[in-house]
């Protein structure tokens, strides 16, 4: 067994005769939670699910809570690394691909879907080499590096927003069923009296810029008739409470909101970042928003996400800079006193919603697996999975030979040998359709 893969001791399913769907996702909640939503749908249909993630990453804590077996790879991101680490990247990636192949041969998935993250790259490449039906779901309008690469040979490319890839299928981002089930904006907002309810979402880690800008902007408005509920993350809770106290603004400051459906139902307006999952929830709930994209987001993808809602008049976009508090004050001055505008934004958001995204993604996965909702053929009835024992022996021999040649060679030469070993040992899997259920990718 490769030291680059850590295999779960939990079997994929009580019956070894049922092939699972493998989910590749990790690193951030934006990748993990959509995967969990789809996993819930698949399992409700009787389809087992297995997960491939990265050692020590967020998915290793979240996924087991849902009783989903997870295997992990020793892999990290490449962006922002020093030159020495980047030079060694090809070797690490090839080893991770080989380790991922080991996991896939053990799990024998009927289909593999990438939601992005560190382990998704090696996992997706291994799926391609072994002929597994590979799909990609990209949550953001600006595609991540991993999904951008995998999209080149994926069977289907699914997106949360239109305009991410050529030939994409914009199915939306999965949201929790209780959020999608909220009444229409008119049923919630028309005829409301009392304070305007402003929901501020800083994400699980909090957003210091919102902790500072929102109290400052509200204080500058001269204490309007507003009720504030601010989700700030555990680490920044004290900081947020101090900011509101200094601004003499009453607010309920919470590190975490468990019932987001109730929070959206309560809100007249939301001030938040522009992560893909958050925007999908805003649309599903039908609530207007003021979006402040995270300035350091990779490829500025949050701004691209926000522009989609702004283009539909469902949100206002404010850039994160030194003048944010002043501009937020100006925007709030208009929105807090204009219920018709808030309702219009909420209705516009609701028209963008795709509440059945998780169901549609599950449908497409099973279509590409060639199984629909039917139970797949037994593993032993299929004509070969991945590579046979003889090929595996050959691969291991070649790998040992390559390992013996590492000493004294440059990183590039070592990576070249690894690539040659990997591709030679999997050539039959690439050229022969049907090694996985559903055929080659």
Swiss-Prot record:
A Pfam family that this protein carries is: Glyco_transf_28
Q: Could you give a GO molecular-function term held by this entry? A: undecaprenyldiphospho-muramoylpentapeptide beta-N-acetylglucosaminyltransferase activity
What enzyme category does the UniProt record give? transferase
Q: How does it sit in the membrane?
A: Peripheral membrane protein
Q: Which reaction does it catalyse?
A: di-trans,octa-cis-undecaprenyl diphospho-N-acetyl-alpha-D-muramoyl-L-alanyl-D-glutamyl-meso-2,6-diaminopimeloyl-D-alanyl-D-alanine + UDP-N-acetyl-alpha-D-glucosamine = di-trans,octa-cis-undecaprenyl diphospho-[N-acetyl-alpha-D-glucosaminyl-(1->4)]-N-acetyl-alpha-D-muramoyl-L-alanyl-D-glutamyl-meso-2,6-diaminopimeloyl-D-alanyl-D-alanine + UDP + H(+)
- Give compartment(s): Cell inner membrane
Biological process per Gene Ontology, one example term: cell division
Q: Which UniProt keywords apply?
A: Cell cycle, Cell division, Cell inner membrane, Cell membrane, Cell shape, Cell wall biogenesis/degradation, Glycosyltransferase, Membrane, Peptidoglycan synthesis, Transferase
Task: List the disulfide bonds in this chain.
Answer: none
Q: Does the keyword Cell cycle apply?
A: yes
- Binding, UDP-N-acetyl-alpha-D-glucosamine: 28-30, 140, 176, 204, 257, 302
The pathway to which it is assigned is: Cell wall biogenesis; peptidoglycan biosynthesis
Q: What is its EC number?
A: 2.4.1.227
Similarity annotation: Belongs to the glycosyltransferase 28 family. MurG subfamily.
Task of the protein: Cell wall formation. Catalyzes the transfer of a GlcNAc subunit on undecaprenyl-pyrophosphoryl-MurNAc-pentapeptide (lipid intermediate I) to form undecaprenyl-pyrophosphoryl-MurNAc-(pentapeptide)GlcNAc (lipid intermediate II).
Mind telling me which NCBIfam families this protein's record contains?
Answer: murG (TIGR01133)
Q: What is this protein called?
A: UDP-N-acetylglucosamine--N-acetylmuramyl-(pentapeptide) pyrophosphoryl-undecaprenol N-acetylglucosamine transferase
Species this chain originates from: Xanthomonas oryzae pv. oryzae (strain KACC10331 / KXO85)
